C-alpha cells in the first residue's frame, strides 16, 4: 500500500521546489507525477499541478489539455496561461502576470499516452489511439489525482482545453458525468467546461474556412464565388469533386506563408529553409472515421490544419516538396519550449522518471502516435452535458483554422434558446475600459452555454491576448460572467 503524506499527495508525486532558469522561489505549491489512466494496459499520464495563488482551499480545480492530437499541455503552461513562461532563449523562464492559477488550482495533463512524458507499458497503444480511449483515460487520470489529493474531492471542477481539446473536453466531461452516475469513485464535482477555438462539427468547421478567407481578403470575392459554385454550395460535402478539390487546394496555396492560426501575423519560424531541412516523406497518421460506415474518409488538408500535419501538407503542396514530419505545433515559436523541457536538469526538477516515448525526446507535439478521430461532431455531447454543467465556448477572432464563424454555425445546430443576443463584453485594461470581444448566451434545462469572441486573438487565445483571456476565465469560474 502506498504511504500517504499529511498534505494528501502520495510518494508517487513530486514536490517541485525549484526550476532551472527561474530567478527566485516558485512561490506556490506545485506537484508533478504520473496519473494512472488504464491499469490493464499500464497507461500513465504525466501531470503538472499548481495551487491557486488566491485561495487554494476554496478555489476550483481546473484540468487543462492542449490539442493536436499529440500536443503537450505543458505547452499551454509554458506559452499561454501557466505561472512560468519559457523565454526565447530556452534557458530562462518568466513569471506570468496573467497565469490562470492566480484564481484556480490548475492541473496540466499530457495526453494521450505517447505525448510528452506520458507513456504506456503496452507500447502498441501508441499506434491505436482514439477519442473514446482518450476520454476514458482522462476521466481515470482525474479520479486518480483526486485520490492522491483528497482535499479536492467535492471541489468545483472544470475541464478546459483548446483546438482538438474541442473533442477531448466534451467527451471527457461526458465520461465523467456517466462515471459519476455509475458510482465511479472518487466523485468528480464537475460544474463546467471551457473550450477555446475548439474542433466542434466537421461540416460547420470546414464550411466556414473559405468564407473566412473571403471576408479577410485572403482570396478574392470573385474566386470565392467560383469556388462556391464548383463545390455546389457545400465545401465539406463536395470536397472530393475534382473542381471543388482544385478550388480548395488553390485557395490554400494562394494564402502564402502566413500564420493561419493568427492571420495578421506571418509565420517566420515555419520558413521554407526550415521546411527543406526537416522534410521527409513520413508524417503522423491521423484517421477520420465516417460516422455512418466507421470507415476512414479522405479529408482535404485545408480542413485539417488544426492537426499539426495539415499545415505541413499545405505548405508542402504550395512549395512542391514533401511534407515534413511534424514534431512541433506549426507557427508557434516552440523550439525554445522544447529546448527547455529536454534539459536534464529541468526533467530532474520536474521529477521525470523515464525517457519519453518519442525517440526524439520531449516535443511540444509528437509524431509517434497514430490517432483516429471517432467523432465528426461533438454536438451530441454538448446536448447531453447541458442539463448538468455550464459551458463556455470562446474563439479568438483572427484564427482561420477553427474559426468563430464555424463554431457559431455549429452551436446554432443545437437549436438552443438564445437568452442574450450579440453584444460586446468589456474589461479594464492598462489602457482603460476596452472591448474584449462579443458574446451570445443560450440556455437549455436551466444550464447555460455561452459563446464569446476574443477580439484580436488567434487560435491560442492566451498567447496573444493574455489579459482578455484571464478576465474571461476568472469571471466564468467565479460565476460573474456567462
UniProtKB/Swiss-Prot annotation:
Top class in the EC scheme: hydrolase
A family per Pfam: Peptidase_S10
Family according to the record: Belongs to the peptidase S10 family.
GO molecular-function term, one example from the UniProt record: serine-type carboxypeptidase activity
Swiss-Prot/TrEMBL induction comment: By growth on mammalian cells.
Superkingdom of this protein's organism: Eukaryota
Signal peptide (UniProt feature, chain positions): none
Keywords assigned: Carboxypeptidase, Hydrolase, Protease
Biological-process GO terms, alphabetical: proteolysis
Name this protein carries in UniProt: Virulence-related protein Nf314
Gene3D superfamilies registered for this protein in UniProt: 3.40.50.12670, alpha/beta hydrolase
Amino acid at each position: 500500500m502506498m504511504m500517504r503524506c499529511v498534505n494528501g499527495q502520495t510518494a508517487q508525486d513530486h514536490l517541485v521546489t525549484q526550476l532551472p532558469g527561474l530567478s527566485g522561489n516558485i512561490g506556490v505549491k506545485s506537484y508533478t507525477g504520473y496519473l494512472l489512466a488504464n491499469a490493464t494496459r499500464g497507461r500513465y499520464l504525466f501531470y503538472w499541478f499548481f495551487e491557486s495563488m488566491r485561495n487554494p482551499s476554496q478555489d476550483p480545480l481546473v484540468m487543462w489539455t492542449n490539442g493536436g492530437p499529440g500536443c503537450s499541455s505543458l505547452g499551454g503552461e509554458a506559452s499561454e496561461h501557466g505561472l512560468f513562461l519559457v523565454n526565447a532563449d530556452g534557458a530562462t523562464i518568466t513569471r506570468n502576470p496573467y497565469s490562470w492559477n492566480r484564481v484556480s488550482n490548475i492541473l496540466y495533463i499530457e495526453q494521450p499516452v505517447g505525448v510528452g512524458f506520458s507513456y504506456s507499458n503496452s507500447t502498441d497503444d501508441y499506434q491505436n489511439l482514439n477519442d473514446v480511449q482518450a476520454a476514458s483515460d482522462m476521466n481515470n487520470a482525474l479520479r486518480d489525482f483526486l485520490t492522491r489529493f483528497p482535499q479536492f474531492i467535492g471541489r468545483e471542477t472544470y475541464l478546459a482545453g483548446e483546438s482538438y481539446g474541442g473533442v477531448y473536453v466534451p467527451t471527457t466531461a461526458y465520461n465523467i458525468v456517466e462515471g459519476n452516475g455509475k458510482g465511479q469513485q472518487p466523485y468528480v464535482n464537475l460544474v463546467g467546461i471551457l473550450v477555446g477555438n475548439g474542433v466542434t462539427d466537421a461540416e460547420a468547421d470546414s464550411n466556414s474556412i473559405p468564407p473566412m478567407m473571403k471576408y479577410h481578403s485572403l482570396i478574392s470575392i470573385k474566386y470565392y464565388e467560383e469556388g462556391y459554385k464548383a463545390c455546389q454550395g457545400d465545401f465539406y460535402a463536395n470536397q472530393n469533386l475534382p473542381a471543388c478539390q482544385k478550388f480548395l487546394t488553390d485557395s490554400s496555396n494562394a494564402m502564402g506563408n502566413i500564420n493561419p492560426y493568427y492571420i495578421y501575423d506571418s509565420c517566420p519560424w515555419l520558413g521554407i529553409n526550415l521546411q527543406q531541412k526537416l522534410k521527409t516523406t513520413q508524417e503522423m497518421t491521423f484517421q477520420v472515421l465516417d460516422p455512418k460506415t466507421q470507415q476512414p474518409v479522405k479529408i482535404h488538408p485545408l480542413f485539417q490544419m488544426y492537426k499539426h500535419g495539415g499545415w505541413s501538407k499545405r505548405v508542402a503542396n504550395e512549395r512542391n516538396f514533401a511534407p515534413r514530419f511534424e514534431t512541433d505545433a506549426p507557427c508557434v515559436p516552440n523550439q525554445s519550449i522544447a529546448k527547455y523541457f529536454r534539459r536534464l536538469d529541468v526533467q530532474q526538477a520536474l521529477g521525470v522518471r523515464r525517457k519519453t516515448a518519442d525517440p526524439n525526446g520531449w516535443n511540444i507535439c509528437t509524431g509517434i502516435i497514430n490517432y483516429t478521430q471517432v467523432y465528426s461532431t461533438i454536438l451530441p455531447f454538448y446536448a447531453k452535458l447541458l442539463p448538468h454543467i455550464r459551458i463556455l465556448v470562446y474563439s479568438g477572432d483572427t484564427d482561420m483554422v477553427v474559426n468563430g464563424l464555424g463554431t457559431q454555425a455549429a452551436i446554432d445546430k443545437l437549436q438552443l434558446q438564445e437568452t442574450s443576443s450579440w453584444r460586446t463584453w468589456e474589461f479594464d485594461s492598462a489602457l482603460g475600459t476596452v472591448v474584449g470581444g462579443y458574446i451570445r448566451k443560450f440556455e437549455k434545462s436551466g444550464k447555460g452555454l455561452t459563446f464569446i469572441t476574443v477580439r484580436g486573438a488567434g487560435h491560442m487565445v492566451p498567447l496573444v491576448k493574455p489579459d482578455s483571456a484571464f478576465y474571461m476565465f476568472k469571471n466564468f469560474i467565479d460565476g460573474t460572467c456567462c
